[in-house]
């Protein structure tokens, strides 16, 4: 007998989630967005863009915490992870939309920041996995040579 998908145990691959790196990227992108928006006369769009990026990072950190707590259970279920994710995303989305509504033009920067952060998150977790598949190493740069020495790629 098979287990229904919603009751199946949660199995997560080991992925490289580096929140400090993402935070630094967020700060750099916020600075660039503020510079570009300031030059075009809409500095607050850049500020709200940075807020959106930081909300995305907060969401990613909350994902990590919830995954750790759910997988620490004796028999983690996908259903609890899905409900946790849906409620967290709903709260962050509503918060972003409230900001966008409260600040009619500049507040849309929050929505764009949230969207761009999701792209950054996917790329930052996909690239290490892709390197592992391509090069056969977790760190993606050090390979074993034919004589047993390490060669830097």
UniProtKB/Swiss-Prot annotation:
Pfam families: ATP-synt_I (PF03899). It is found in: Cell membrane. GO terms for cellular component: plasma membrane. The keyword Membrane applies. To M.tuberculosis Rv1303. Its main location: membrane. This is Uncharacterized protein ML1138. It comes from Mycobacterium leprae (strain TN). Keywords: Cell membrane, Membrane, Transmembrane, Transmembrane helix. It is a multi-pass membrane protein. The keyword Signal does not apply. The chain crosses the membrane at residues 22-42, 43-63, 89-105, 112-130. InterPro entries: ATP_synth_I.
């Amino acid at each position: 007998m098979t287990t229904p998908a919603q009751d199946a145990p949660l199995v997560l691959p080991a992925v490289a989630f580096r929140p400090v790196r993402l935070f630094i990227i967020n700060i750099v992108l916020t600075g660039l967005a503020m510079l570009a928006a300031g030059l075009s006369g809409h500095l607050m769009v850049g500020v709200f863009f940075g807020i959106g990026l930081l909300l995305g990072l907060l969401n990613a950190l909350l994902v990590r915490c919830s995954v750790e707590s759910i997988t620490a259970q004796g028999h983690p279920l996908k259903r609890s992870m899905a409900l946790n994710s849906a409620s967290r995303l709903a709260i962050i989305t509503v918060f972003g939309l409230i900001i966008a509504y409260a600040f009619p033009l500049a507040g849309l920067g929050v929505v764009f920041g949230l969207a761009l952060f999701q792209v950054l998150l996917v790329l930052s977790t996909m690239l290490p996995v892709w390197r592992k598949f391509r090069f056969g190493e977790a760190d993606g740069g050090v390979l074993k040579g034919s004589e047993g020495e390490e060669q830097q790629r």
